[in-house]
Amino acid sequence: MKLSALLALSASTAVLAAPAVHHSDNHHHNDKRAVVTVTQYVNADGTVVIPAANTATSAAADGKVESVAAATTTLSSTAAAATTSAAASSSSSSSSSSSSVGSGDFEDGTISCSDFPSGQGAVSLDWLGLGGWASIMDMNGNTATSCQDGYYCSYACSPGYAKTQWPSEQPSDGRSVGGLYCKNGKLYRSNTDTNSLCVEGQGSAQAVNKVSGSIAICGTDYPGSENMVVPTVVGAGSSQPINVIKEDSYYQWQGKKTSAQYYVNNAGVSVEDGCIWGTEGSGVGNWAPVVLGAGYTDGITYLSIIPNPNNKEAPNFNIKIVATDGSTVNGACSYENGVYSGSGSDGCTVSVTSGSANFVFY
């Protein structure tokens, strides 16, 4: 079928949850959620495809990719949240064959809800004031500041990894809930298909920092509060893995795949100041100057640089997506001196058909 006859299928499905209902004795700083709009290119048979593009194979880690991205990713604002339009989308239950971080399997009913399970691969987020948890929420949208009976206690994993725990039954109003379940004062898995708390992503992207300051990259707590609190801190002159969600086997929102989303703060902003739900004009958290997207589906990795409608200011660095040595990437994507490559203000996406690519900050 000719590419001119391809259909652009916009699965515009609101992941916007109603504002969180506050428990009478508890509080939470975030009443806003993200709205995700998934745009995919399909043929007449409904198969997801990407338009033909010149394929560039990098001969070196900093080699340039020549072609224009097959699909672009845009982020537009609403009063309550940001909207992401991406070629990559999100995912369902985790794969038991994937590797995990942590010392052994998680055992239900052995850890008190008052204790954070850091020895099981989860990463404590002490600056949030939630006992290390990324968020604490029940099925009705009530939030709390301590993990307690009837609540799902969501957690972060190390860079390159994602949490495995969320209940298969999700709220009917479109909110998402994730984490370990607290029952009778003990922690239990909400997804018993896996014994580990964290699962490795596709491993097809890294963040490479070539500027003089540390950069706090903040992933969203999803499924869960969708706050941008999951940290990947890239020190000056160093690199860290980016969690590229394996969409075909990860959490799905109402039957639709989901990808990872990251808010990138200016260089020099600490993780404690940057990986939070920010306030208007703060330039941090949901007000960070740029957003990244990452997902893997049907054998292809999609990586995006996305404008944040909350903050039109350029970051204090440039960003480009660069193929690693020997890898094959379709498209070119950069954000340099406040200007996106390609169509201009809508951001850009590349597809990695073999190997991996780097988000390079320079």
Curated annotation (Swiss-Prot):
InterPro entries: Beta-Glucosidase_SUN, SUN. One of its GO terms (cellular component) is extracellular region. The lineage of its organism: Eukaryota, Fungi, Dikarya, Ascomycota, Saccharomycotina. One of its GO terms (molecular function) is hydrolase activity, acting on glycosyl bonds. It is found in: Mitochondrion outer membrane; Secreted, Cell wall. PANTHER family: BETA-GLUCOSIDASE-LIKE PROTEIN NCA3, MITOCHONDRIAL-RELATED (PTHR31316:SF2). Belongs to the SUN family. Keywords: Autophagy, Carbohydrate metabolism, Cell cycle, Cell division, Cell wall, Cell wall biogenesis/degradation, Glycosidase, Hydrolase, Membrane, Mitochondrion, Mitochondrion outer membrane, Polysaccharide degradation, Secreted, Septation, Signal, Stress response. Its EC number is 3.2.1.-. This is Probable secreted beta-glucosidase UTH1. Involved in aging, oxidative stress response, and in the regulation of mitochondrial biogenesis. Inactivation of UTH1 increases life span, leads to higher resistance to heat stress and to hydrogen peroxide, and increases sensitivity to the superoxide radical-generating drug paraquat and to copper. Also required for the selective autophagic degradation of mitochondria (mitophagy) in response to nitrogen starvation. Involved in the remodeling of the cell wall during the various phases of yeast culture development and under various environmental conditions and plays a role in septation. GO terms for biological process: autophagy; division septum assembly; fungal-type cell wall organization; polysaccharide catabolic process. It comes from the Eukaryota. Its main location: mitochondrion. Residues 1-17 form the signal peptide. The keyword Cell inner membrane does not apply. Pfam families: SUN. It is a peripheral membrane protein.
